[in-house]
Amino acid sequence: MEKPYNKNEGNLENEGKPEDEVEPDDEGKSDEEEKPDAEGKTECEGKRKAEGEPGDEGQLEDKGSQEKQGKSEGEGKPQGEGKPASQAKPEGQPRAAEKRPAGDYVPRKAKRKTDRGTDDSPKDSQEDLQERHLSSEEMMRECGDVSRAQEELRKKQKMGGFHWMQRDVQDPFAPRGQRGVRGVRGGGRGQRGLHDIPYL
């Protein structure tokens, strides 16, 4: 009992944890885990300042979540694994971008696009309203023209659709015989008398 207690007594990272969760392998990892944590913060803050986004509240939340992540990584590892966090993850990527709750994540490009749209939209909408502002008479004329054009189109389509039926329309009561059954173009009119013959 005395050995694990003495080993972890001076370890800053394990102060708030119960003794059950403390692992003796964590002693060598604590310094290496803190380095990428600090680097990730500075990279993330530098990017935000360069972009000029007001993100003070978001920075505070990110820092808190990063510290929690650093502690939880040490807890979840089995005793057999001795890899430090800096070897497992490349240092080129900022730590904040690796693990973040899905609800908090908003892509930066999408933010920029929506911001641009809201800045320009009031001016554009006023111009559009002025252009669209027509008198009621003009509106009625336009609507009338459109409806007339649609009616004409319908009539043309109906008339065009019946061109192939004109032969049958001319003599609707003519005897049909086997025309519909054969499927021959022209209805098989040349063989009208064949259906009267009982045997061929």
Swiss-Prot record:
Location relative to the cell: Nucleus
Modified residues (Phosphoserine): 30, 65
Region entry Disordered, spans: 1-200
Domain of life: Eukaryota
Xref: InterPro entries: TF_A-like/BEX
Any GO CC annotation of this UniProt entry: nucleus
Biased composition (Acidic residues): 20-36
Pfam families: BEX (PF04538)
Swiss-Prot/TrEMBL keywords: Nucleus, Phosphoprotein, Transcription, Transcription regulation
Start-end of Basic and acidic residues biased regions: 37-52, 60-80, 115-154
Family membership: Belongs to the TFS-II family. TFA subfamily.
Annotated function: May be involved in transcriptional regulation.
Listed name of the protein: Transcription elongation factor A protein-like 6
